[in-house]
Curated annotation (Swiss-Prot):
Biased composition (Acidic residues): 21-32
Subunit structure: Subunit of dynactin, a multiprotein complex associated with dynein.
Keywords: Coiled coil, Cytoplasm, Cytoskeleton, Dynein, Membrane, Microtubule, Phosphoprotein
Top-level taxon in the UniProt lineage: Eukaryota
GO cellular component: axon cytoplasm; cell cortex; centrosome; cytoplasm; dynactin complex; dynein complex; membrane; microtubule
InterPro entries named in the record: Dynamitin (IPR028133)
Annotated organism of origin: Drosophila melanogaster
Start and end residues of each stretch annotated as Disordered: 1-32
Protein name (record): Dynactin subunit 2
Amino acid sequence: MADPKFQNLPGIAYDQPDVYETPDDPELDTSDYYEEEPENEAIERLHISPSVAHKRFSGATVEGSVDFTDRIGRRMCRGYDTRGSSDYELVGQGEKETPVQKCQRLQIEMNELLNEVAALQVDRKVADEEKQSYDAVATVISTARKVLESLKLEQVLGKEQTPGSKQVKALISQVEEFKQSGVLTAIPTPGTDLAATARVASLEQRISQLEKVLGAQPDKLSRLTAATNTTNVLEAVRHLSTKAALIQPDKLDTIEQRLTSLAGKMDAIAEKSSGSAQDAKRDQKITELYDIAKRTEPVVEILPHVIERMQALEALHKYANNFAKIIAEIEQKQGTITTSLVNNKELLHSVQETFAQNLETINSKVAKVEQRVAAISSAK
């Protein structure tokens, strides 16, 4: 029977049953028979597991600098770039980067540059001078990377400057943890949602008012904190107000008088410090004594032991001194004896010569006497 709401409508047959027709299924042109292709040894058939391939390329990204060719060169061709556990969000073309995104991009580029420099350092075809330059570049890059890591922009600038994808991933991980824990929480009532929304709106209003008063540019706040040496805005304002109070006209005369008296005192101190020629000589002697004391600092610790040793060896030194004096006297006496021996040798030589001459004269005279005696005896 037709629905009562369709009564009194034209074109409806009320005396016939309701029929719901469906189109017939078309005949399938395909057959269940598949002709197996003959095996060809020239065709390599690889057995690839979809799950293993998905795990391998799950975190891979493709950029404009990829190169899937098999060219041979000094640099390796880049294919799919797997970031690993560190996921960084890159902004689109024309969009403005946040400071954290700039820092992350610089870290990635520095890591790539360090890898390239390390590959060039290992290369044997590169000259030693180029390797030294690469070492200097690697040192500079590592220092800059340490500086970037020490900045900790996410902690300094807050969550407003961090990319939104990290917050989304953190929320997803929290949801997964809640699912695994199985702890159920009650859905908040609409009244609590409205109260939380009102609280958030009031906080946003207060933040906007603070941004209007202080400014939303972090570089200005950093300059203010650097100038006042404080991170509290009220303390900075008080510091600036005290400085502004000092610049008032009624206090400038007092400041000028104090500066004049201070300048006079500084001149007097400078005159006293200059001194006369005697003071200069005294300072020079003091400086020399100080230099001598600085040079003898390494010997100061050994000096008491040396003095004790010298005192212990004092008697031995005296005996050695006396022995040296005795040896000197003996050498002197030996010298005099040697000279006297030389003189005695000369005298002996002269005596021997005179004795030989006298002996010859005596022999000649004795011969003459014998001749005379013989002549006399023959004459008788």
